[in-house]
């Protein structure tokens, strides 16, 4: 009986931990252009065990493996972007990616792809608008974590 009431509670708690971290990081990144590692670390150590427990409760190891593969894939993508952008994409964003990758890929590959695309499209569109309005220069850096947060939230909710 209790099992049915808590059917996806562990996944829900993992999502809450992730979004709480994303909210804090969005505020910090927006104000300082810094992404503290201790918060990204807390996100990983709080969300990953809950996702593992959810996979064990539902006896579906393939979801868990997909989640870990998604964490690695997003980390590699963000790392590549960080290298190619020569500092335009921060290490904090790269270090945040496994937390987002495991949560979204655990839910499904489509969530991972949508969350990633939403993040970059939102950042691109809003940056273009700010450039057009003169609020942002071509060489200015933007805080990317808020876009990651909104993109991830949209992928989970839609």
Give residue ranges: language-model regions.
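Interfacial loop-to-transmembrane junctions
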Residues: 128-154
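Central hydrophobic cores of alpha-helical transmembrane segments in multi-pass inner-membrane proteins
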Residues: 18-24
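Alpha-helical transmembrane segments
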Residues: 10-17, 39-42, 67-71, 143-147
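N-terminal transmembrane signal-anchor/hairpin module of polytopic inner-membrane proteins
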Residues: 1-9
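Functional transmembrane core segments of multi-pass inner-membrane proteins
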Residues: 24-25, 30-124
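Alpha-helical structural context
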Residues: 5, 83-84, 103, 132, ...
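Hydrophobic alpha-helical transmembrane segments
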Residues: 48-55, 149-158
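Hydrophobic transmembrane alpha-helices of multi-pass small-molecule transporters
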Residues: 51, 123-127, 131, 156
């Amino acid at each position: 009986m209790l099992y049915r009431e808590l059917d996806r509670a562990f996944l829900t708690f993992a999502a809450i931990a992730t979004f709480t971290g994303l909210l804090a990081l969005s505020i910090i990144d927006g104000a300082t252009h810094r992404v503290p590692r201790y918060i990204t670390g807390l996100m990983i150590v709080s969300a990953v065990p809950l996702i593992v427990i959810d996979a064990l409760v539902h006896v579906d190891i393939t979801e868990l493996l997909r989640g870990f593969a998604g964490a690695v894939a997003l980390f590699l993508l963000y790392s590549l972007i960080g290298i190619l952008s020569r500092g335009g994409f921060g290490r904090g964003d790269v270090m945040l990616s496994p937390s987002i990758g495991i949560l979204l890929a655990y839910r499904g590959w489509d969530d991972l792809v949508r969350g990633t695309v939403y993040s970059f499209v939102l950042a691109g569109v809003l940056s273009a608008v700010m450039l057009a309005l003169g609020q942002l220069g071509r060489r200015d850096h933007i805080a990317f974590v808020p876009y990651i947060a909104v993109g991830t939230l949209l992928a989970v909710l839609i």
